[in-house]
Amino acid sequence: MPSATSHSGSGSKSSGPPPPSGSSGSEAAAGAGAAAPASQHPATGTGAVQTEAMKQILGVIDKKLRNLEKKKGKLDDYQERMNKGERLNQDQLDAVSKYQEVTNNLEFAKELQRSFMALSQDIQKTIKKTARREQLMREEAEQKRLKTVLELQYVLDKLGDDEVRTDLKQGLNGVPILSEEELSLLDEFYKLVDPERDMSLRLNEQYEHASIHLWDLLEGKEKPVCGTTYKVLKEIVERVFQSNYFDSTHNHQNGLCEEEEAASAPAVEDQVPEAEPEPAEEYTEQSEVESTEYVNRQFMAETQFTSGEKEQVDEWTVETVEVVNSLQQQPQAASPSVPEPHSLTPVAQADPLVRRQRVQDLMAQMQGPYNFIQDSMLDFENQTLDPAIVSAQPMNPTQNMDMPQLVCPPVHSESRLAQPNQVPVQPEATQVPLVSSTSEGYTASQPLYQPSHATEQRPQKEPIDQIQATISLNTDQTTASSSLPAASQPQVFQAGTSKPLHSSGINVNAAPFQSMQTVFNMNAPVPPVNEPETLKQQNQYQASYNQSFSSQPHQVEQTELQQEQLQTVVGTYHGSPDQSHQVTGNHQQPPQQNTGFPRSNQPYYNSRGVSRGGSRGARGLMNGYRGPANGFRGGYDGYRPSFSNTPNSGYTQSQFSAPRDYSGYQRDGYQQNFKRGSGQSGPRGAPRGRGGPPRPNRGMPQMNTQQVN
C-alpha cells in the first residue's frame, strides 16, 4: 500500500481505461524526431520563424507530458484498489502491469521538455544578438554611404576652381590624377546631382531624381549616364579620394585669416603687462576689507552698527593701521615707479583714551546686559533670604565718588567717553529696582547704582528690640549726592558684597561689577510680635507716602535733602502717621532663634514660585502678600513694603520697570488684610479683595513693633 501511494502522480485521473504503453512510447519518439530537424532550423530561418517553431515544439511536448501524468494517476488508482482487495478486470490488470513503463516515459518527457526550454532560451539569445549585429552593420553601411555622398559633393564643388583643376591635371610628383575628359564627365554629373532650380517641377521631385543618380553612383551600376556608366564615374571619384589631394591642400582664405590672427597675437601680449594691476594695491585692499567687515558683523552692537559706517571703520581698524602701513611700504620699496597706492584708505589716528574707552565699551557689550541673567545663574549663600526688612544707611562720601561714570543718567549717553579708565555700563542695565511713588500715583525715576570698592562690615551690637524704619540722609550723603550728575535723587543703600541680591536680577559676579561693592544685605533679624498688638495697629497706617523724587532730565544741585520717613510693614503691621521708625541696620540676632522667622504651618506662595536659597517657611514670606515688591500696581498708600529677616538688610522695594501680573495672590485660602487705598494710579481700578474688618495674616508670624521717638 505505501509503495502504491508513493508512485502516485500529480495528474488528474481519467474515467476511461489507459491506452497501451506501446502507443505512449511511439508518441514520445515521434516528438523527439520532430524536434531534431527543428534544432537545425535557426541556422536557416529568420528569427521570427524560429521562435514560432520552437513554441509549437514546446506545446506538443507539454501536451504529451500531461497525458502521461493522467495515465500514471489512473494506474495509481488501480493499484490502490487492488491493494485493498478489490477485484479488477483483465484490462485493468494489464494496465497495472505497465506502471513502470509509464513512469519511465513520464520522466523522459519531463527531461525532454527541460532540454527544449533551454534550447529555446539559447535560440532567443542568438536571435537577439544577430538582430543587433545586423542593425549595427546596417547603420555602419548607411553612415558610410552618407560620408561618401558628402565627400562626392565636396569634390564636385571644388572642381569649379581653376587652381584645383590645374593641380588635378598636373598631379602630384608629375603624375596626373584626372584627365580633361574625366573632368568633363564629372562636370556633367555635377549638373545631375545638383541641378538648377526648375520651377516647372516641385522641389521634392527635382531632388528625388538627383538622389537616384547618387544612389546609382554609390552602387556602381552599369547604367549609362553622361556618355559613360555609374561604375566608371565611381572609379574616377574613388581615385580622387585615394590621391589625398584635398587632405594636403589648404584654403587660401583660411590661411590669410590664420596669418592675421598670428600677427595680432603679439600685440595683445604687449598690452597685457601694461594693464596688470599692482599686487600691493590688491593686497592692502583685501586686508582692510576683511578686518573691517569681520569685526563689524560679529561684535558691533546693533545701535552702533547703524549709526555710521565711517565711525566703525575708524574704531576697529585703528589697531591694524601699522600693519597696513608696513604692507604698503614694502611694495613701494620694491617698485619705486608707483608713487602711492590708490586702494589704501587712510585712517586717522584716534585718541588713545577714546580708543581705550571703546575697547572697554566692547568688553561691556560682549558681557551682555545683566537684566537678562536668569535667576538660576545667581549664587546664594544665605539660606534665610527674605526681602521683608528695609535697612538703609547713607554711603560714605568717598565711596560715592569712586565711579561717577556708573551714575550718569541714560539721557546723557555721550558722557561715556568722558572717563576712559572706567568700564561703562549700558543705561538700561544699570537700573536698580526702587519704588519712588507718591500718594496719588506711581512715578518712575532713574535710580543711581553707586558702587564701592571697599567692603564695609557693619557691627551687630544694638539691642534687638529697637527696630527703626526711618532712612536718615545725613549731610555727607547730601554732599555726595549733589555732586553726581543724575536725573533724579534716589535712595542709596549699602551692604556687604558677600550677600548677592535675588529680586534685583543683577549678577554681581559679572565682569562690569567685579570692581563694585554690592549695596544690599539680607541679614537683618526681626523678632516676632503678638497678634493683639497687630490688630490694634492695623488701621493706623499712614495715609500717604511722603517720599518723592525729582524727575528732571537735567543735572540739578541739591544742597540739602529732606529727611524722608520710610514706614514698612511686616505681615499685618501698620505704623501710625505719627510714628517715626529708624532702621540702623545694627541688630543682634537673638540666641533662641536660628533664623529670622520660624517655620509657619501654612505659608502663602504666590504664582511666581519660591526663591532659591531660603528655607521653606522663609520663602513663603517673600512674596506672600501684595505689595510693590511682588507686582502690585495700585495706590501705594494702602500697602507698605515688607521687612527682611536677615541681618544687615539694605534692600528696598523694587521699581516697576517691568510690571508683572501675579494672578495667584488670593489662592490657598489667603485673604488680603485691607482694601486698596483711595489713590488708584495703577492699571487696575477696582480692588480684588474683600471689604470689612481686616484679618490677621495666616501664612506669616506676627512681629512686635516698638515706637521710637
Curated annotation (Swiss-Prot):
Naturally occurring in which organism (per UniProt): Homo sapiens (Human)
Glycan-modified residues: 644, 649
Resulting phenotype, residue 690 to K: Abolished ability to undergo liquid-liquid phase separation for the formation of a membraneless compartment
Alphabetized UniProt keyword annotations: Acetylation, ATP-binding, Autism, Autism spectrum disorder, Cell projection, Coiled coil, Cytoplasm, Differentiation, Disease variant, Glycoprotein, Intellectual disability, Methylation, Neurodegeneration, Nucleotide-binding, Phosphoprotein, Protein synthesis inhibitor, RNA-binding
Coiled coil: 60-94, 125-153
Name this protein carries in UniProt: Caprin-1
Effect of residue 676 to K: Abolished ability to undergo liquid-liquid phase separation for the formation of a membraneless compartment
Lineage, highest ranks first: Eukaryota, Metazoa, Chordata, Craniata, Vertebrata
Residues the record lists as Omega-N-methylarginine modifications: 165, 626, 633, 640, 698
